[in-house]
């Protein structure tokens, strides 16, 4: 098996992992009833857009579809940081509300351990990075 074949199989595997992640994440969020506020729909939207980009790159890996995948996966990863910020700021606000004597510094650790899981949105960062890795030195994107 040539190196090109191995690289192509690895790209397909990574696309599969990204697709599974982008399907399972919204499913878990539905189970957690993560649908009460408008901002809670962000992971659903970016997961859907990510799935469309993955499907395009899987079905027809062209320069255009791979660039779309790259940029979409960057947006997926960035949205994850928005989620981490929202989770942390919600926990921090709640901690300061129930402990008015706390300074912001005192509230940092309890906010990190709060009811909104700080790192849970990070799964989309992982999906985004893996999706971008698929495009790394892809033959369709390499100049001849």
Regions found by a protein language model. Give the residues of each.
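Alpha-helical membrane-associated segments of multi-pass integral membrane proteins
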Residues: 99-140
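Interfacial segments of alpha-helical transmembrane regions
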Residues: 11-16, 64-78
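Membrane-helix interface and helix-disruption motif detector
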Residues: 32-41, 91, 112-119
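Transmembrane alpha-helix entry/boundary detector in multi-pass membrane proteins
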Residues: 10-11, 29-50
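Canonical alpha-helical transmembrane segments
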Residues: 48-69
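Non-cytosolic membrane-interface motifs at loop->transmembrane helix junctions
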Residues: 36-46, 69, 100-103, 108-110
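Cytosolic juxtamembrane helix and N-cap/initiation of the first transmembrane helix
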Residues: 1-19
